[in-house]
């Protein structure tokens, strides 16, 4: 699985980006792109904001999680997924794991926001609290 994960982590490739977009669009709605005139005035060019906070888990991280799960085989996902995070990555992996019916375990540090932990659990993932910071988790 590591080799396949490394392939998903390659340098940005426009063709693969478009392929990922097609995959992601099967699972979540496109987020709005809004022109902000005041921001445009302040920075001296046209400014558009992509509202990734409107995604199911509140961030763009769900895109990577969905693309990851989509490209893994049933055998590769058989034992479930284990991730370490303080927030958005864990939320996204837990949500996508629930969608793909793959068990997900999320390791978080001791000082993690309890509300984030609760939401991760609400997506069906197991939360393990370990360590003083993200790196320990």
Question: Where do the protein language model's features map onto the residues?
Answer:
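PLP-dependent amino-acid enzyme catalytic core
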Residues: 1-137
């Amino acid at each position: 699985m590591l080799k396949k994960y490394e392939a998903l982590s390659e340098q940005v490739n426009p063709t693969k980006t478009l392929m990922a977009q097609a995959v992601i669009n099967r699972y979540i709605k496109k987020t709005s792109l809004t022109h902000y005139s005041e921001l445009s005035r302040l920075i001296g060019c046209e400014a558009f904001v992509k509202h990734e906070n409107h995604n199911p888990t509140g961030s763009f991280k769900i895109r990577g999680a969905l693309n990851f799960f989509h490209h893994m085989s049933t055998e590769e996902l058989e034992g479930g997924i284990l991730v370490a995070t303080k927030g958005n990555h864990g939320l996204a992996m837990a949500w996508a794991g629930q969608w793909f019916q793959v068990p997900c375990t999320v390791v978080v540090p001791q000082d993690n926001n309890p509300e984030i932990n609760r939401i991760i659990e609400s997506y069906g993932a197991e939360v393990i609290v370990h360590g003083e910071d993200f790196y320990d988790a």
